Amino acid sequence: MAKKYFGTDGVRGEVGQFPITPDFVLKLGYAAGQVLVQHDTDQKPTVLIGKDTRISGYMLEAALVAGFTAAGVNVVQTGPLPTPGVAYLTRALRLSAGVMISASHNTYSDNGIKFFAEGGVKLSDEVELEIEAKIDEEMKTQPSARLGRARRISGADDRYIEFCKSTFPGHSDLRGLKLVIDTANGAGYGVAPKVFHELGAQVVSIGNEPNGYNINEKCGATHTKTLQAAVLQNEADYGIALDGDGDRLMMVDKNRQVYDGDSLIYVIAKARAREGINIGGVVGTVMTNMAMEIALKEQGVDFCRAKVGDRYVLEQLNQRGWLIGGEASGHILCMDKHNTGDGIISALQVLAALQILNQDLATVCADWQPYPQTMINVRIQKGQKWQEASKDVLAEVEKELEGKGRVVLRASGTEPVVRVMVEARQADWARDGAERIAAAIGGI
């Protein structure tokens, strides 16, 4: 059954436009509260709510609190806290569910609602459908004796900081390192610099002055130029960039070289292999560069691909019992450290890996160079049989690139576009293959 309101990462959109309106979010909180009450019959459920620094967070938090308490659910509020911090505290405090108010790397004019189940894991499709079924029902507030309470929780930041630090090797520290930390004027501004400082690093903080409107604005993991300049200006060893809700990571070295999620995953996996730790393998996505796959296999590390999205990477990790996964966008999962993507913890794992390998980022990542990619968006008509039109040329290109490149065709879920991606050992092979396939699709 198709979902009506939930996307791949909760409910998200432009503030003031459906579904990110106070009245809908009130109903969403009430519907989720009803489902919790039905599932937790022994005692009154308690939900933890965190948020990033968007101005709309105040409005949406109030609406959620009203909905949950009307359904008979207690609420604890953390204030600004990274998404993985909400997941951790939901598990650590043994709460019924967690909710994060954020639109991740989007601009301040967007926002969203993301749910975590008991244990800090993402909601199943079945539970999301249960919630959706109740959203359109009439709200019937619980009798006064059964209404929920709401309160602010103290020490949430400190609990999460200590958890992050606990994932770094206990026999080591970060003394001698100078780091620039860019928190994207987002949810990590109050916690990320403290984590690295308390582990001994000299920390320079940027993107740490949120005003409600500047989240992700020319800063953070989606805009690394600011970090590159700051690393150079401060003569730092590395720069660490998070996104608005703190679950993505990009890094920069002293030469201003940017390292994406693929490169950082490789560093972590290589160090684990060097230590003899059995990680099972690495899960990437259909967009992960083929050169990384080959480099991992040369280290004796298995590799598989999931659909694009950290949700699908997580599914594959759980199914296979593997420990490391992620995507180039900076979502990195280290399942032996946390059960969700965490930018701070991922950065700590990279820094620990560099100590284990006794090399810098540039040296480790010199093991492989990304294959050149050509991407072409082909606009099509509704109902156009593009698969049939392109199958012969697709087969030809795939045969030519066997063992030295690959092809990915993806139909957009939001617009009438087919995305053609070809990567190959040589740039002209990739360009030629992509152009031939795009021409065969036809387009308009």
Swiss-Prot record:
It catalyses: alpha-D-glucosamine 1-phosphate = D-glucosamine 6-phosphate. Binds 1 Mg(2+) ion per subunit. Its cofactor is Mg(2+). The keyword Phosphoprotein applies. Its EC number is 5.4.2.10. One of its GO terms (cellular component) is cytosol. One of its GO terms (biological process) is UDP-N-acetylglucosamine biosynthetic process. Coiled coil: none annotated. Mg(2+) binds at residues 104, 243, 245, 247. Belongs to the phosphohexose mutase family. This is Phosphoglucosamine mutase. It comes from Neisseria gonorrhoeae (strain ATCC 700825 / FA 1090).
